């Protein structure tokens, strides 16, 4: 049995790998665009329905090179009444079924989370 790969076979393999890498990159760009649109909708909703004062996106959705299939949308919120938190999260999760939203109340966030938000 001959297990050697010819240069032609190797080029076919490499071309396929390049094509898959390009498709993955395009998919992540689209995911980031959708995530940013959902973030805008979320900010409007939080301000309008819950009186939030400020909303900031942070985390992997901001950086294409860190974005992956399981990336969620991390939002920091100021001025949300703690009693409204779960109701707000429920509304945010209904904005797009493919984008999970992680809502962080800045006033009660742990220091290491605040550091990430500030970056």
At which residue positions do the language-model features occur?
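Catalytic core of pol beta-like nucleotidyltransferases
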Residues: 1-53, 63-69, 79-119
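Glycine-rich beta-strand-to-loop/alpha-helix junction loops that act as flexible
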Residues: 57-60
